[in-house]
């Protein structure tokens, strides 16, 4: 059911995405008995829709990992479990890999804003930055503003529109605004919409 929802949503994302536009998905594998490789399923869905795969980034969250003791059989080969301290950022394109812009757009409104050192750092496939507190944000699964900020700086120009079909607490919209991009966000949960609007307004003041 969850995968069917993702397929429906990302089919619409593909429809409205500009040629060469990028789709970036933050996702984690789940479970232990059995372990469910959600990233593999999502990759298949996206390729079936027609997206081109650009690569995947590992978000290393180990610096802010909790004190979980869910290691299965402790200090024994009986049934040890891996404790995931990373998530995936899957990157796709529509139609082609290059995001085109005219000479006029390059001069006037659609500009790059990423700094040289950040560009070099962001091309590496492992990103390290801390997680966001669910209690602090008021959302069960928030990601830090740093995550969409990096993707927006790396994959878009100023004035571009950033779409988040699962806007949640509004982190993507906040990052887009900070980076000089426009944004559109959706969510089926009215409480999350109110939360996102509140956070966006706070950032604007």
Describe every region a protein language model picked out.
Residues 1-195:
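Core catalytic lobe of class I
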């Amino acid at each position: 059911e969850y995968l069917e929802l993702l397929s429906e949503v990302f089919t619409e994302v593909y429809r409205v995405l500009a040629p060469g536009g990028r789709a970036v998905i933050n996702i984690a594998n789940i479970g232990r008995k059995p372990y469910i490789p959600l990233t593999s399923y999502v990759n298949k869905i996206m390729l079936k829709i027609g997206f081109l795969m650009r690569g995947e980034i590992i978000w290393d969250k180990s610096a802010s990992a909790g004190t979980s003791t869910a290691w299965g059989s402790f200090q024994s080969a009986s049934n040890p479990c891996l404790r995931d301290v990373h998530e995936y950022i899957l990157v796709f394109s529509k139609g082609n890999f290059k995001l085109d812009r005219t000479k006029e757009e390059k001069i006037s409104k659609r500009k790059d804003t990423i700094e040289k050192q950040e560009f070099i750092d962001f091309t590496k496939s492992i990103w390290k930055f801390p997680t966001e507190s669910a209690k602090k944000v008021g959302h069960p699964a928030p990601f830090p503003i740093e995550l969409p900020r990096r993707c927006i700086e790396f994959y878009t120009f100023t004035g571009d529109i950033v779409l988040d079909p699962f806007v949640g607490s509004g982190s993507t919209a906040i990052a887009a605004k900070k980076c000089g991009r426009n944004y559109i966000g959706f969510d089926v949960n009215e409480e999350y919409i109110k939360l996102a609007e509140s956070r966006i307004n706070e950032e604007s003041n």
